[in-house]
């Protein structure tokens, strides 16, 4: 780059003082353009070089596992205790269920049993607020929330779960995967609030697994499980395992058909695959894996 700058200096500066006003203007504009291009090229080279030289992580999963996997489900849908949890229990797989107290109260005894059996109960707010661009969320739109209102709601949800199930939630899932409150210049992220109140916060419809040596536990990526075949999910698993990452799958209904439904056939195939020691997968609930990461990464 120094050579290029020197060349420009030789070509233009020596004649600059003899140029008319228009020529000087065009020359300056040309030099600005060249410097901009060279700067962008230099940055690109540095970025690529940095990517190539990233140090290898010394993070390792327990018992020589090559990746971690968590199955998570939202909203305390009725199909979860009716059909999904018995299937998970059949294979000894522990999942995380992010519940809203209103839905949970329809099957309190079943949710108590699930918690006692090692499934994690997480916080998913009281009202399930999302952007008001969803008409069903207009009366509880995130655009109308304040941080104080959100903090009160999340605390209320945790208190209700504690009162009804005897569980202190340490994991949270952002409703609709949205992490903002307010509008325009008054928009605020409530990720710091979640980081203060919980061990982890899970997103929704993300495109990558989580690097245990780097990920922000308050903003965990989660890939959709709803509507997926085992073959489709297996590709996500293979990607995560190649990097030693943590794949979080997120779903809603646990049934054989319907909208926002994680297929029982897919879940069963996942369980069988994940518990096979040859596949090198640590499958566990979000809390257990997040806690391990928090205590073991440098």
Question: What residues fall within each predicted segment?
Answer:
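Bacterial Sec-dependent N-terminal signal peptides
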Residues: 3-46
């Amino acid at each position: 780059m120094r050579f290029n700058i020197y060349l420009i200096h030789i070509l233009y500066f020596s004649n600059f003082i003899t140029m008319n006003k228009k020529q000087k203007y065009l020359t300056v504009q040309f030099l600005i353009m060249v410097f901009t291009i060279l700067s962008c090229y230099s940055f690109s080279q540095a970025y690529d070089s940095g990517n190539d030289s990233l140090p290898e992580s010394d993070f390792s999963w327990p018992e020589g596992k090559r990746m971690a996997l968590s199955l998570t489900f939202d909203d305390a849908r009725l199909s979860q205790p009716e059909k999904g949890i018995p299937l998970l229990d059949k294979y000894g797989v522990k999942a995380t269920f992010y519940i809203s107290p209103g839905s949970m109260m329809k099957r309190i005894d079943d949710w108590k049993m699930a918690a006692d059996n090692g499934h994690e109960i997480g916080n998913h707010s009281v009202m399930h607020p999302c952007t008001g661009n969803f008409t069903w969320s207009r009366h509880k739109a995130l655009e109308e929330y304040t941080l104080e209102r959100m903090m009160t709601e999340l605390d209320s949800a945790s208190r209700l779960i504690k009162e009804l199930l005897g569980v202190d939630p340490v994991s949270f899932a952002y409703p609709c995967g949205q992490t903002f409150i307010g509008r325009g210049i008054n928009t605020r992220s409530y990720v710091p609030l979640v980081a203060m109140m919980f061990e982890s916060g899970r997103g929704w419809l993300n495109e990558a697994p989580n690097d245990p040596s780097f990920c922000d536990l308050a903003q965990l990526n989660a890939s959709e499980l709803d509507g997926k075949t085992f073959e489709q999910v297996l590709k996500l698993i293979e990607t995560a395992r190649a990097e030693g990452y943590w794949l979080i799958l997120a779903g809603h209904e646990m049934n054989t058909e319907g909208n926002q439904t994680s297929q029982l056939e897919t879940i069963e195939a996942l369980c069988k695959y994940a518990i096979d020691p040859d596949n090198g997968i640590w499958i566990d609930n979000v809390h257990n894996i997040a806690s391990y990461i928090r205590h073991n990464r440098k």
